[in-house]
């Protein structure tokens, strides 16, 4: 079974396939926030989407993080460290990339189990 959630004209924010949940790349909606604020907003949205799919941050398997400037990795990691389930750390990559909106400082994509 495949279930798609929060669809737009071009993508689904979350897709369930069997016991796996795939989240699209999530960016903050309030791009006036600093990197910590954007990261917090993104992680809150990840919590919401995972919950909608019957999952949680404790079941995150893999996470890809893009930052517009690698120097933002340190403040992003401060927020990440407060959020992540320390007993169930996912595989993770964090790289610098030019994001679609120049005001976006962070984008996070997650794969989780149920």
Where are each of the predicted segments found?
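N-terminal presequence-like segments and the immediate start of the first folded domain
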Residues: 1-61, 67-114
